[in-house]
């Protein structure tokens, strides 16, 4: 198995373990979680405010929020008794750098294949 450290993501960027990458992609694999992430990047919300926007229980929305938190894609803070959730733009950029590294690998492979085909 190839380590994500070997992808040479951005030297100044995050250093992902296999488990961290799994959590990020698992979180982003669900449409509801992507929508929650979009909403919390646009502005802070409570879980109750988020739950009002979906045709599912508060507990189900809470589980989606937990998955996003475990992936590091959203953070929370308290204002009095209220727990406010917001998307973490730095984490999103880190995930983008990881995807960019994968793209670079595949582009290099295609370029090598093109070069081999051009030799014939």
Q: Which ranges hold each PLM region?
A:
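Amphipathic alpha-helical dimerization/coiled-coil segments
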Residues: 1-20, 38, 93-120
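N-terminal helix-turn-helix DNA-binding core of bacterial DNA-binding proteins
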Residues: 19-59, 79-97
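Short, hydrophobic-biased segments on the C-terminal half of alpha helices
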Residues: 65-66
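Glycine-centered, phosphate/nucleic-acid-interacting loop/turn motifs that mediate DNA/RNA or nucleotide
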Residues: 72
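Short beta-strand "wing" residues that participate in macromolecule-binding interfaces
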Residues: 76
């Amino acid at each position: 198995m190839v380590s994500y450290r070997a992808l040479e993501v951005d030297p100044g960027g995050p250093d992902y373990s296999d488990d961290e990458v799994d959590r990020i992609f698992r979180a982003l694999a669900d449409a509801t979680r992507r929508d929650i992430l979009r909403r919390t990047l646009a502005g802070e919300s409570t879980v109750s405010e988020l739950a009002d926007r979906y045709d599912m229980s508060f507990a189900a929305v809470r589980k989606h929020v937990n998955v996003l938190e475990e992936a590091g894609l959203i953070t929370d803070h308290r204002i009095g008794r209220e727990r406010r959730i917001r998307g973490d733009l730095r984490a999103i950029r880190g995930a983008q750098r990881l995807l960019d590294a994968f793209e670079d690998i595949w582009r290099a492979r295609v370029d090598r294949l093109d070069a081999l085909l051009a030799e014939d």
